[in-house]
Amino acid sequence: MNPNFLDFEQPIADLQAKIEELRLVGNDNSLNIGDEISRLQDKSKTLTEDIFGKLTSWQIARLARHPKRPYTLDYIEHIFTEFDELHGDRHFSDDAAIVGGVARLEDQPVMVIGHQKGREVREKVRRNFGMPRPEGYRKACRLMEMAERFKMPILTFIDTPGAYPGIDAEERNQSEAIAWNLRVMARLKTPIIATVIGEGGSGGALAIGVCDQLNMLQYSTYAVISPEGCASILWKTAEKAPDAAEAMGITAERLKGLGIVDKVISEPLGGAHRDPAAAAASIRAELSSQLAMLKKFDNEALLKRRYDRLMSYGL
């Protein structure tokens, strides 16, 4: 099976394979295959719309983890200019699972921070599969405080299975690092916009997710635990993950209905990995619009709005 397609996309993969086969013989002038290719492309689009129009929560969770899905650095390349990455937490080390730095969104200087997974094996290991250690969150905190000092808005991109649960992270006080970020972000006197671009996993996501405006991409997820983890606790088997995903309400539309998410950003047909540039353009438009809205608030009004927003959860 084509690795760019998940199992529920197999009918689409089959059609795409037929289209590629026809293209390979396209140089044979004795065959007029242009019309047939167009017909199959239309059929593929219709089939994709049908499949993606009725995705389950579990299928969306799998799309959120798609190995070809754009990551934070991909979006930074498409959305911002003059990005200058900053490193280190000034306490222990630099954590590659969190990237951040100053950049420009159009003409506005901003601080951009996000989780970063890896593509190849070595990069996955170097970035710890997008699971930050305490030094990653402390680096993020340092950059956010710098942004406040220089009056720069903060834009975060969330994409992590969760904070790293290893013994070394616990020895360096993982829970304190996350809690400290929550405290600091709640009080920062600068606009904060968070966007979930893939997996929003528990406290590992929340540690850069306290904000004035929360966006989720259409096929992203946000939850206190993975569906597999929830299923293992409740049903003693990860095979019940699809049931857990449905019960947990992890999708953007469900969370928008609960008032947790402010905006669901549409993705290209088939997911952001099918057209990263188009996905980035949609995010850029929302960030620009939301930033213009938030800049109308003075510091006191901004903090009150943020506090009221947080206190409304669960009501």
Swiss-Prot record:
Listed EC numbers: 2.1.3.15
Metabolic or biological pathway: Lipid metabolism; malonyl-CoA biosynthesis; malonyl-CoA from acetyl-CoA: step 1/1
Catalytic activity: N(6)-carboxybiotinyl-L-lysyl-[protein] + acetyl-CoA = N(6)-biotinyl-L-lysyl-[protein] + malonyl-CoA
GO terms, biological process: fatty acid biosynthetic process; malonyl-CoA biosynthetic process
Pfam families cross-referenced by the UniProt entry: ACCA (PF03255)
Location relative to the cell: Cytoplasm
Keywords: ATP-binding, Cytoplasm, Fatty acid biosynthesis, Fatty acid metabolism, Lipid biosynthesis, Lipid metabolism, Nucleotide-binding, Transferase
InterPro entries, sorted: Acetyl_CoA_COase_a_su, ClpP/crotonase-like_dom_sf, COA_CT_C
Listed GO CC annotations: acetyl-CoA carboxylase complex
Principal location listed in the UniProt entry: cytoplasm
Domain named CoA carboxyltransferase C-terminal: residues: 40-293
HAMAP family, A to Z: AcetylCoA_CT_alpha
Subunit composition and interactions: Acetyl-CoA carboxylase is a heterohexamer composed of biotin carboxyl carrier protein (AccB), biotin carboxylase (AccC) and two subunits each of ACCase subunit alpha (AccA) and ACCase subunit beta (AccD).
Protein function: Component of the acetyl coenzyme A carboxylase (ACC) complex. First, biotin carboxylase catalyzes the carboxylation of biotin on its carrier protein (BCCP) and then the CO(2) group is transferred by the carboxyltransferase to acetyl-CoA to form malonyl-CoA.
PANTHER family attached to this UniProt entry: ACETYL-COENZYME A CARBOXYLASE CARBOXYL TRANSFERASE SUBUNIT ALPHA, ACETYL-COENZYME A CARBOXYLASE CARBOXYL TRANSFERASE SUBUNIT ALPHA, CHLOROPLASTIC
Family the entry assigns: Belongs to the AccA family.
Record protein name field: Acetyl-coenzyme A carboxylase carboxyl transferase subunit alpha
Organism: Pseudomonas fluorescens (strain Pf0-1)
